[in-house]
Amino acid sequence: MSILALVEDRPTPKEVYNWRIYLLAAVASFTSCMIGYDSAFIGTTLALSSFREEFGFNTMSKTAVNLVSANIVSCYQAGAFFGAFLAYPVGHFWGRKWGLLFSGAIFTLGAGLMLGADGDRGLGLLYGGRVLAGLGVGAGSNITPIYISEMAPPSIRGRLVGVYELGWQIGGLVGFWINYGVSETLAPSHKQWIIPFAVQLIPSGLLLIGAVFLKESPRWLFSRGRREDAIKNLCWIRQLPADHIYMIEEIGAVDQALEEQRATIGLGFWKPFKAAGTNKKVMYRLFLGSMLFFWQNGSGINAINYYSPTVFKSIGLQGANTSMFSTGIFGVVKTVVTFVWLLYLIDRLGRRLLLLIGAAGASVCLFIVGAYIKIADPASNPTQEMTGGGIAAMFFFYLYTVFYTPSWNGTPWVMNSEMFEPNMRSLAQACAAASNWFWNFLISRFTPQMFAKMEYGVWFFFASLMVLSIVFVFFLLPETKGIPLESMDALFESRPIWRAHETVLARLREDEERFRHDIEESGYSKTGDQQVEHLSEDLPKV
């Protein structure tokens, strides 16, 4: 079987897998480039001697430096938390396309404010700019996965939402290396540290330009009663005529889902809030989605992203440039493994198995790194060169990255984008994204203090949380791979959880055969002037 082979819930014409759907996902994913770049560059920028001298870090105590650094990093996450909720009314009333434009505009304004900061003006503009930039990326982290999942065919939904994660890693790769580049090529100066801040404007500018040409989400248009526009956009995205049997099936499924929502949750801005507070099924799924981000942040990945110099110093690396270079390698490993996840793992192995394998492997690696720090105590016994034990610890650190990246890095975003019915999706994604930024804020705010107080215990702490996440996934989280968005209710109601996927997929295949049989019995055999493709081959087994 080809590495790019797809698992389909029903026979899918090859026209559906066209360049348009990938282009739309790529343009929308400039939001994740913004997020990835910021999460990667800020830690090493704060470590640049030019930045520390201009803002007086060299005259502060270590405790004060840790506090100011944590405030600079974490005010961005605080803004993102509120931005995730702000995106709900924007996405509901304005649509997904205008929500993306809103996200890019707010981020660009914040990035511009940061460029006005200097030693004379102090850190005020930096704080304000990072809060605004956080609002922008918080909104983008809500809307982008929804936009992509609502357009994607089920068989490549994981891959397309994975483009969002790929954008995150590409932005991160640039962010991890840029400070190494400026530290090697430029003398310490205002210019040296301002360049990394200025680069933030590139992905936000590309988003603002590209989003103008995006097609609005057909599912959002259906929910707003704009049926003609919805069908027109869906036909453009699928490259199929409206009377093709595949389109009839998809439009019928959307109509049926909307009718069920009218009869249960109801359509409208406030209805999801009522359901979230009174419907136990919705509350349970919100709990699952939010907990996914608790476990993701509990892996320690954002402690590494934001404070990589501190992390590598705890292992025994000496010198700012050495830490920046090691951070760059960390970014390369994450990006390469993300490609493997995107092209092969997410829609072949599925979400659930990836999370289980990733948590098991990553926890072992973290325990080993923590044990090395406990035994060797590199902070108290510094050496000019890495010892054999230190090299082994670095190996297991990068191996941790290999386990974590194709599992917990992007998969929670994929699952949260597909777990909820259309009228709940915006609010649910807002809650999930806000949950991510809340845990992200706690990690970014307290990581310096944790390393100062706990030392090797930090590694054991994150490893233990990853072990606990295995129990959570196995007993509570069903596999969502290849399941249409309109069938998620049936998936989460099926028991036992570890067999829910195969149960629902078998039911969908039966419904598909019955639908096509009814179509043939009714005499429907043409689409326009062309014969309908009666795809009779069996669906792939999962």
UniProtKB/Swiss-Prot annotation:
InterPro entries referenced in this protein's UniProt entry, alphabetically: MFS_dom (IPR020846), MFS_sugar_transport-like (IPR005828), MFS_Sugar_Transporters (IPR050360), MFS_trans_sf (IPR036259), Sugar/inositol_transpt (IPR003663), Sugar_transporter_CS (IPR005829)
Biased composition (Basic and acidic residues): 531-542
Ranges in the topological domain labelled Cytoplasmic: 1-22, 88-97, 152-159, 215-285, 347-352, 409-456
Places the protein is found: Cell membrane
Modification after translation (UniProt): Ubiquitinated. Deubiquitinated by creB, probably to control its activity or amount.
Annotated transmembrane regions: 23-43, 67-87, 98-118, 131-151, 160-180, 194-214, 286-306, 326-346, 353-373, 388-408, 457-477
Keyword Cell membrane recorded: yes
Main location group: membrane
GO-annotated cellular components: plasma membrane
Superkingdom: Eukaryota
Keywords: Cell membrane, Membrane, Quinate metabolism, Transmembrane, Transmembrane helix, Transport, Ubl conjugation
GO BP annotations, alphabetical order: quinate metabolic process
Region (Disordered): 519-542
Membrane topology recorded in Swiss-Prot or TrEMBL: Multi-pass membrane protein
Gene3D superfamilies: MFS general substrate transporter like domains (1.20.1250.20)
A family per Pfam: Sugar_tr
Matches recorded under NCBIfam families: SP (TIGR00879)
Assembly information from the UniProt record: Interacts with creB.
Record-stated family: Belongs to the major facilitator superfamily. Sugar transporter (TC 2.A.1.1) family.
Function: Integral membrane transporter that imports quinic acid to be catabolized as a carbon source.
Entry protein name: Probable quinate permease
Lineage of the organism: Eukaryota, Fungi, Dikarya, Ascomycota, Pezizomycotina
